[in-house]
Curated annotation (Swiss-Prot):
Residues 390-399, 493-503 have a biased composition (Basic and acidic residues). Residues 389-470 form the NET domain. Residues 530-564 have a biased composition (Low complexity). GO terms for cellular component: nucleus. Residues 346-365 have a biased composition (Pro residues). Residues 131-145 have a biased composition (Basic residues). Residues 504-517 have a biased composition (Acidic residues). This is Transcription factor GTE2. The keyword Flavoprotein does not apply. The NET domain could serve as an interface to localize different proteins or complexes to chromatin. It is found in: Nucleus. It comes from Arabidopsis thaliana (Mouse-ear cress).
């Protein structure tokens, strides 16, 4: 199909005839009644005698012209026929323009055929002017097409056109975003180097074109974007990246231009990559909706899949059966294995070498068993806590805030008779203690790690000893303890096993080597007023501290978590003075 063209007028004939002849390229489908139409002349040769001669005869003087153009004698048409012809030619011209725009924009759908329906004009009959056929005036719109069996149906064509418009809209929005990114990039404080093309002559860069194959700058990218030379955002991004990669290729690493190009390239990727991902997602969405088959297509595909599956099942089953037949004779028939009856003795034979059974520990007293059970239950509840460091560890861990808080509360709960020992520990570790009269201010946060753990061991030993004594019911009044204290020794043994099981996780074994205290008389200490004021306790409390220190030293001898400093700090200095002579 080609647009109608105006043939050259022959001036001698034009003077004799008042009409004009318009020529149109001849199509494969002739107009209805054109061959028999007396006004139809397929030969535009003016030298022919019958160009405007007898209407009933047809002459083909120039046979080569037939099939190339169709001529219309405008003098023989009425006004209605001329209007119909004008509408027809305008419609074809609009269709050609529409197709041209689609081809240039790249949204042309291959496989769609755009043709013009053949319309018969009024008066194109054998009898001119005798009988005029009235045709209904039909409004001709853009894109009116001839029914073609090879063309796509009208609903699918409309869907393709709508999807093309959606894709074009998405592309336009993306290119607008690219322009905004380019403006932000050009406003960067380091982009002034890349705004204009490199002045090779002015800067004396004689080897620039040898290293850089395709020079590019942001100003050129902006100009190309405004002219619409980029068909996709990928082309735009490639030119922007080319600007910075050229600078990084020519300038050595570490120079200012290299660092500026590297920074701007990373910034461009940060701005552009999320936008590109959104654009690709929208494109996939549009393409997915365009490739979505209709119900008839689904039915057709389903039928084809079923036929293919049934056709595929047959050969597979046959081949599998053949393979099984070929494998069967290859398998030898093995005789059944003989049945072996095994009679088992009711008792298995003893092994020749048996390790000697471990010696059973002697039965523990009831009090010791209760103490070990209590320690085990306590250890079960402390699985989530951090283990306390041993006294002989050179590198002890830092005490946590919770442990410091508990230590402060336990120090405030100490009885007055234990304050003397507490002061001795503090004076041994800290030289200068802030003292206000009889009161000493103690800042736990200011103490070092060793002092904190030593105070913790001192408080823990006292609390364990006091709880065991109260639980067993051997002490009625702390100020007046009894003279014979065999339960104290028994408590010390139980405490030793409890601490050993709590920290080392070993089994509690009593080997019966504890020295009974009832064979020895209790120690009584007589102190004067000055010594009593220095120690801060009474004679009864001194007796208690002496016995407590003996049990504490006894427990420290069998425990891995104890320390020699505890035993020294717990024992009263007056006992040492008395034992010295």
């Amino acid at each position: 199909m080609a647009p109608a063209v105006l043939a050259n007028l022959n001036e001698p004939l034009f003077l004799g005839q008042c009409g004009a002849v318009f020529m149109r390229k001849y199509t494969n489908q002739p107009l209805s009644g054109d061959i028999n139409n007396p006004l139809f002349n397929p030969n535009p040769n003016p030298n022919s005698i019958s160009a405007y001669g007898n209407n009933s005869s047809k002459h083909f003087d120039d046979s080569s012209a037939y099939g190339d153009y169709v001529s219309f004698d405008l003098d023989g048409y009425t006004s209605n026929q001329l209007r119909e012809l004008k509408k027809r030619l305008n419609s074809e011209l609009e269709e050609v323009r529409f197709l041209r725009e689609r081809i240039e924009s790249g949204t042309f759908v291959s496989g769609s055929v755009y043709t013009t329906q053949a319309r018969s004009f009024a008066g194109e009959t054998n009898d001119v002017g005798v009988k005029k056929t009235k045709t209904k005036k039909k409004k001709i719109g853009h894109g009116q097409k001839r029914s073609n069996p090879f063309a796509t149906d009208e609903p699918s064509l409309k869907r393709h056109v709508a999807l093309d418009l959606m894709s074009e809209k998405v592309l336009k929005s993306m290119m607008t975003t690219c322009g905004q990114i380019l403006v932000k990039l050009m406003k960067h404080k380091w982009s002034w180097v890349f705004l204009n093309p490199v002045d090779v002559v002015g800067l004396g860069l004689h080897d620039y074109h040898r290293i850089v194959d395709k020079p590019m700058d942001l100003g050129t990218v902006k100009m190309n974007l405004e002219k619409g030379l980029y068909r996709s955002p990928i082309d735009f991004a490639s030119d922007v990246r080319l600007t910075f990669t050229n600078a990084m290729s020519y300038n050595p690493k570490g120079q200012d231009v290299y660092l500026m190009a590297e920074k701007l390239l990373s910034q461009f990727d940060v701005w552009f990559n999320p936008t590109l991902k959104r654009f690709e997602a929208q494109e996939v969405k549009v393409m997915g909706s365009s490739s979505r088959p209709g119900p008839e297509d689904n039915q057709r595909v389903w039928n084809q899949n079923n036929v293919a599956e049934n056709a595929r099942k047959g050969p597979e089953q046959i081949s599998i059966a053949k393979k099984l037949d070929s494998v069967k004779p290859l398998l030898p028939t093995l005789p059944p294995p003989p049945v072996i009856e095994i009679t088992r003795d009711p008792s298995p034979p003893p092994s020749p070498v048996q390790p000697p059974p471990p010696p059973s520990p002697p039965p523990q007293p009831v009090n010791q068993v209760e103490a070990s059970l209590e320690v085990r239950e306590t250890n079960k509840g402390r699985k989530g806590k951090l283990p306390k460091p041993k006294a002989k560890d050179p590198n002890k861990r830092e005490m946590t805030m919770d442990e410091k808080g508990k230590l402060g509360v336990n120090l405030q709960e100490l009885p007055p008779e234990k304050l003397g020992q507490l002061i001795q520990i503090l004076r041994k570790r800290t030289r200068d203690l802030p003292q206000d009269g009889d009161e000493i201010e103690l800042d736990i946060e200011a103490l070092d790690n060793e002092t904190l753990w030593e105070l913790d061991r001192f408080v823990t030993n006292y609390r364990k000893m006091a709880s065991k004594i109260k639980r067993q019911g051997f002490i009625q009044n702390v100020s007046t303890p009894p003279r014979n204290m065999p339960p104290v020794t028994e408590m010390g043994s139980a405490e030793k096993r409890g601490r050993k099981g709590g920290e080392a996780g070993e089994e509690d074994v009593d080997i019966g080597e504890d020295i009974p205290v009832e064979d020895y008389p209790s120690v009584e200490i007589e102190r004067d007023g000055t010594a009593a004021a220095a120690s801060g306790g009474s004679s009864s409390s001194g007796s208690f501290s002496s016995s407590g220190s003996s049990s504490s030293s006894d427990s420290e001898s069998g425990s891995s978590s104890g320390s020699d400093s505890d035993a020294d700090s717990v024992q009263s200095p007056f006992v040492e003075a008395k034992e010295a002579p």
